[in-house]
Amino acid sequence: GNAAFVTITFNRIDSKIYVLDCINMTEPNPQKIRQTIEDLVLKYKPQEFRVEINAHQKAYSLDEDLRSWLSSYGVRLEAHFTGKNKWDTNFGVASMSTLFGTVRDGKFQGNNTIELPSTADSEGMKALVQQLITWKPNTRGKTDTVMALWFAVLRAREFMQQNSNMARYANNRWATRAQSSRKVSINLDEAFAEQWQENYG
């Protein structure tokens, strides 16, 4: 099989996910994979590197030398186990479809959360776009780049939730009595109007 690497960034200001790079490695071996990891870290200086640990890739999450090298550049290595959850329509790969925006009356609405770069000079990006177009649940075709994007999007969604104003108003069952006593009620109509004014006013 192939090994795929997708590099993204999440912009907290516009709440968009920007895909920076995609590498679709044919005939991967440990040396090529390690070199690609190092190249991506040096080029993009990420905060986190996610690795699927289902097959032989598990060795990377256990590789203390790699962990040490990554930490010397301030990069955390996170392991991701893929089970049947990848087919879950609310959480899995299919849930990314809404992030690419919607079409109404045959017209794109411009409401996408994911921005893809040009495919002109990148075979990896061409592969990602092609796999996104042809992806369907339980597919037997190549899905390496789509899966790599999904791992990255899972992390971006965590940032999106932290960035959401909803987190401020959500119930917290672990709140202390002091924190609970400082809770206040708000008028959602007024809060929405205020947020609308801040964002679009």
What is each of the regions a protein language model found here?
Residues 72-118:
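Short alpha-helix plus adjacent loop in nuclease-associated cores
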